Amino acid sequence: MSAITRIIDKIGIVGTIVGSFSCAMCFPAAASLGAAIGLGFLSQWEGLFVQWLIPIFASVALLATLAGWFSHRQWQRTLLGSIGPVLALVGVFGLTHHFLDKDLARVIFYTGLVVMFLVSIWDMVNPANRRCATDGCETPAPRS
């Protein structure tokens, strides 16, 4: 991925995680962690974070991952990078729009956050490299 795409991806992930720190009613484990590290003041903007910022930042992370596909052409990396934001979006929308049980929505959201975090660490440790050219992959010459 290009440096800009990687930075945008990290901004989306950090924004989603920090946004989850603000909602004690929705995501008690994340809010407890946020309060423990001094981010308890975010709870006064709980509605803004849950309704707008978490979905926006998760969408930014998803779009950055999908944009990275055009740089590295690795479907496995793109799939793994997309799972976390999609789970986070399903969890937060399931909770705010009441189409999922609260506990199930929380589990899905937390799973999405963990996947986003782990894939982000993996991306920093092992950055993506282009495997194919934009016009297609070269096939190796046949062995004789």
Curated annotation (Swiss-Prot):
Hg(2+) binds at residues 23, 26. Pfam families: MerC. It is a multi-pass membrane protein. Induction: Constitutively expressed. The keyword Transport applies. Signal peptide: none annotated. One of its GO terms (molecular function) is metal ion binding. Keywords: Cell inner membrane, Cell membrane, Membrane, Mercuric resistance, Mercury, Metal-binding, Transmembrane, Transmembrane helix, Transport. Changing residue 97 to E: No change in activity. This is Mercuric transport protein MerC. It comes from Acidithiobacillus ferrooxidans.
